[in-house]
């Protein structure tokens, strides 16, 4: 399971649409998750791999009103790859444990009675354990506006601009939407904890006052700097896929969310590149099952 979908799930849990708006003042948020990607085969090249992922984050926001806020969030986690057999990417394991550390600022402000703006700059380090942080850092910016067209429907455009390791800056459009289709059905994009690269799309159904079921999907691409003592010294690893998960979320009170998810990753590909970003080898991998749990606590 990759960072961007996982952080999007956390962002969904923490979004104003799902958590009750607190009174003006300071708001503390703690969040975390664990996910497991089951072992899957690496295409025609042979070999297989599995993945375990954990993440913890902490945020502090000051709210002047439900539409005006400024905050900071910090977080970190680890993706533990476990390769088996000859992968075709490298003579041994192409990489091991991947660390992720990030900090982001979140600014939300009203433009007029119906339009709200949001700006989220971020700084991130993605590296294999032992790799240099100075060669593994990237920056990003998410910005957008949302129009409240009517009760239960908010929509608007946005843009994401993200630096990439040894590659050109990536720019992509974003659709911001929060649509109450009925009293129980909702279609929305989460804000994405830690400024993940573009929000995913989630359809939810409020089964009871405390339980919500959902379906979430997004495109994923994660790049990370490799250690100097591996098969690709100082190079770049990439994991690219399209995850789709079903979620079941329990909310015992307005400030607490616990979510369980299960699904699969489709169209996966791993890539190993040298220190300048030139591709050394690639390998597709079969559809992989994934499952896990996430929580958000807000005070």
Regions of interest found by a model, annotated:
Residues 20-86, 184, 190, 213, ...:
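Short glycine/proline- and aromatic-enriched beta-strand/turn motifs that initiate or cap beta-hairpins
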Residues 22, 62-66, 109-115, 147-151, ...:
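Outer-membrane beta-barrel strand-turn architecture
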Residues 32-34, 117-127, 153-163, 175, ...:
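Transmembrane beta-strand segments that form the barrel wall of outer-membrane beta-barrel proteins
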Residues 42-46, 87-93, 126-131, 142, ...:
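Extracellular loop and loop/strand-boundary signature of outer-membrane beta-barrel proteins
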Residues 52-58, 99-105, 121-125, 139-143, ...:
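Hydrophobic, lipid-facing positions within transmembrane beta-strands of outer-membrane proteins
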Residues 66-72, 113-119, 151-157, 184-188, ...:
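Repeated loop/turn-to-beta-strand initiation elements of outer-membrane beta-barrel proteins
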Residues 91-93, 188, 202-204, 208-280:
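Outer membrane beta-barrel transmembrane domains
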Residues 174-184, 246-256, 283-299:
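Outer-membrane beta-barrel "beta-signal"
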